[in-house]
A protein has these predicted regions:
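Polybasic, proline/glycine-rich intrinsically disordered low-complexity segments
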Residues: 28-31, 38, 45, 69-146
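N-terminal low-complexity, intrinsically disordered segments
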Residues: 2-69
Length: 146
């Protein structure tokens, strides 16, 4: 799937569903590239917002490069990340917005979680920046690699 062929599995015929679908189309066109990804450098870290191809929710990632974080820092980031850390592989740490209380736009299960909330691009980007800020502050305000 690309940003141009948004096809939810189930389309409920109601105003809220139509509004969310239109919002996501605009969000993809405004922020995300052809791979449904947005990246930027923030305070010395590469951060990324990506759309899950199958379920449609957004995920956020921080590239720690060669940096190691300790248990205290991991726990801090886990508390700040939406729904907790769900990804930590090869010095990349991240979270997703596909929990039971979130709207997963391409999912056929949305009708079961109709009281959920769609976590938009700005929500994910701000959550990533909050995590990076906390990580930098946990090191005395200076980046320390290695």
């Amino acid at each position: 799937k690309t940003m141009y062929d948004f096809r939810p599995i189930v389309v409920l015929d109601d105003a809220r569903t139509r509004e969310i679908i239109e919002f996501i189309k605009n969000e993809n066109l405004t922020y995300l590239d052809d791979n449904l990804c947005y990246t930027e450098e923030y305070r010395g870290y590469s951060i990324a917002v990506m759309r899950h191809v199958d379920l449609g929710h957004l995920c956020g990632y921080i590239d720690l490069a060669e940096e190691n974080i300790n248990e205290k820092q991991y726990n801090l980031l886990d508390r700040l990340a939406h729904g907790g850390i769900t990804h930590y592989i090869n010095n990349e740490i991240g979270f997703d917005c596909g929990h039971c209380y979130d709207i997963m736009p391409y999912s056929c299960f949305n009708n079961l979680f109709c009281s959920g909330k769609y976590r938009d691009f700005n929500y994910v980007l701000n959550n990533l920046k909050e995590m990076v800020d906390a990580l930098v502050e946990s090191k005395g305000g200076q980046l320390q690699c290695g």
